[in-house]
Amino acid sequence: AYLYFTHAWEKKDKNQDPIFTMENYPKIDGSTATLPLAQAYKSAFTGTDIENVDVTHSKTHNAYVNLINKKSDLILVTYPSEEEQQLAKDAGVELEIVPVVKEAFVFFVNKENSIDNLTLNQIQDIYSGKVTNWKEVGGTDAQILAYQRPQNSGSQSGMLSLVMQGIKMKEPEKETVAQSMVDIVDVVSDYQNKENAIGYSYYYYITTMYSKGKIKLLSVNGIEPTYDNIKTGLYNIQTAYYAVIRKDEPENSNARKLLNAMISTYGQKVAKEAGYVQNY
């Protein structure tokens, strides 16, 4: 399914010669949240109108599997989970992982929830099961329904490494593990007891690909997750979207050429115009 996003890459730079043709463009894959980035890059680097660019992503875990199995040349993803790193090791594949754009990990609640800010410790307590009621963190007397994501999804890997940092997460109830970014947003947004749900995802996805009026992003430790706060590092639950290739790609390979184009000045301009936070 195609996802429509509000920050579209629309204008090709007429002063910029295409680097690739549609025929020799490397086979790319990636996560849901990097699909617009991949489309923007392919449009810019081939000199093709965005509506004529066909890119499909098979989501984070499958993208890693495809790269390891040489079914794709470059993937745009979050950092590999321990399981994905082990898969590569078992296959004798060394991964080259390069940050392309900045990203932040964000938490959201229904707009009717009175809470606007949580500390990182409070979030850890909620997801470890230590805190179970909103009144314990300054909200109303309602049980917290803390949504999780499936293992090996980009969001779950981010939650474990960036937020929990070794603290064991409580076992999720099966109905609270959303199967995709869209699912987790829908459940938090439309849950009947509107004050009691919390979810998490990546900033770009929530603000650009899934702008849904019924949710609000929470400040963490008093800092709002805004574009500027992410770019400056003030909002510090940060990661990146990475371009990953097999390390044995030759210097003159198209995969390596594409990677270098993504982190070039022009590549970063393309990323910014597509709504992502520049890394360089």
Predicted regions and their residues:
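Exported/periplasmic ABC-transporter solute-binding proteins
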Residues: 1-87, 93-103, 108-280
